[in-house]
Design a protein with these regions (language model features):
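Cytosolic, membrane-interface loops and tails of multi-pass inner-membrane proteins
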Residues: 2-3, 7-37, 93-108, 160-179
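Membrane-embedded alpha-helical segments that form the functional core of polytopic membrane enzymes
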Residues: 38-93, 143-148, 206-222
Length: 222
């Protein structure tokens, strides 16, 4: 990736995290490239959040109940992202649920199958997200939907901040671990300020509590 172009980093991130039919990136995934791609993940979140908010807005003008709209948004985001985060959540919870030593946890997480703990986590996370989307749709909190999805993706940046080592010595995690500056924590604060400014112009004004609650939910389960 020449000069770590932000545009190229976003291109790689979109290709990696979504099913959007962009040209296949031709880059060498070294540590510098991987770090730039991780930094671009919240931009993908902004794209996904905009799609989710626009879909919620359109569906809110139909006869569909908001609960069903929430479910459709969760399913839609899972399809757009290849279910990558859903699969990762299941692997993580299955690993933690085995109550074994670190080696056993890593083995379970790499198995590729979904166990009872992982299945329960998927159902619980999907239900929480659907209820959250439904509540925000019912109150016409379109900016909060975008904000929540963006901050949910920003969790990946925080997980790769300096000072945190990789779980394994090989793989993509080893490439990107510790590549993000700690100062990047200011971005969620900027996003919150931006959401407050934009949300104030929406119907009924802006309620920071909704954005914070929604963002917290998506950071935990996205």
């Amino acid at each position: 990736m020449k000069h770590h172009s932000p545009v190229r980093a976003i291109h790689v991130a979109v290709s990696w995290l979504t099913v959007v039919p962009v040209p296949t990136p031709t880059v060498e995934m070294d540590r510098c490239t991987g770090g730039a791609v991780i930094t671009a993940v919240p931009v993908v979140g902004a794209l996904l959040g905009t799609v989710a908010a626009a879909s919620a807005f359109g569906l809110s003008h139909t006869a569909l109940p908001t609960a069903l709209i929430g479910v459709l948004l969760v399913v839609g985001l899972a399809l757009i992202t290849r279910g990558m985060h859903v699969d990762g959540l299941a692997d993580t919870v299955d690993g933690l649920g085995c109550y074994g030593p670190p080696e056993r946890v890593a083995e379970v997480m790499k198995s590729g199958s979904v166990g009872p703990f992982g299945a329960a986590a998927i159902v619980a996370a999907g239900a929480v997200q659907a209820v959250g989307f439904a509540a925000l749709t019912d109150q016409h909190r379109w900016y909060d939907i975008v904000f929540a999805v963006v901050v949910g993706r920003f969790a990946a940046v925080l997980a790769c901040r300096r000072g945190l080592g990789p779980a394994a010595a090989t793989g993509f995690g080893a490439i990107v671990a510790g590549t993000q500056r700690r100062s990047l924590i200011v971005w969620p604060i900027i996003l919150l300020a931006g959401a407050a400014t934009l949300g104030a112009a929406g119907p009924g004004g802006y309620d920071a509590a909704h954005a914070v609650a929604a963002a917290t939910t998506f950071v935990v389960v996205a």
